[in-house]
């Protein structure tokens, strides 16, 4: 028989073990914090003054997301918020993150950013989330630290390995030491914004696969709110089981009446300008007129990026606000000013991503822009007939452009194509903004379209499927 160890010796042994583990755990945490992207969290200094929803706007969609978070009977663990470029997804994610933080729902957040090196790749995603989890769920801190102290190479392992060693196993260890119900009052929402801003479509698909497996295989207790543009590879990932069964989708469309919110935003911001501008006493009244505000609302096409860009341009203490608004409307020459630089940068990035098919895509854009006034129902089938394209090829050509235009699915060929942004036409037809690569010369485009119409009408035996399906709505 083994000799009986006196109780006081056991206590001393446990105390020694604890004293050894504490510095070891702290060393592991220090290693972790060297391999994170601290600027990715919702309240980081790097993201000072991040975009968020203007007061009294986006109330319906914010409430829908918060209802999903608190619904204890829901069957889904992912909420995918998607919509066109510039629709305001990041502002909604930021506002939800702040609301969740206030209510102690937020476990962690990661805001991807295409232009910042440690926030545009998958490499630091899990370590950054873990660094936030050890604060929001302190019971796992020691277990995470010891795991990294014992095996620092975890910091360069795959995302799956990191989730298992730094999230799953620490949660299991904390459950053993703290009881099965220790997570009942801990935050369980993880927010990921701008998934499409992570480099490489393969990385974006991989992230979704890893997160899905963390729920499906390891049953981690978290729910994920993700936001992105509706890029083809992301849509396809969410369409496949089991992720499709685990996901609630929210599309930012006209259901949420964005024009109403944009009007509220513009009216509020113009009031701020009138109250704060150094020459406010001399501003005309009323300014701007209701008609001018309505023009801006219509030009925004439901996308907040246009409205916010306009306000940033006009809200300058060094310029006369009515003159700046005239530049926006094209009444006054813009000179060297670049009022739409932010929007132009967005359009350029999206169009460059479709570079393999850009020449044909621009032909399609020209048809949409210059036949629009004929009130035609311009469907994929019509485009293929008019441009003599192979049947079905339109869906391939436009597959990377879903963030700036509505493209029906292949089994909805009778639905029309349309731009999400009315301002896209202004960009494409302004050489100073779109440059040599994407510029559409109005005269050349009109001439080419007329020549196509004449050629096809003069050659009825050519086998053309051309017909003009006038819109009935």
Segments predicted by a language model, with ranges:
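Conserved NB-ARC/NACHT P-loop NTPase core of NLR-like innate immune receptors
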Residues: 2-455, 464, 469
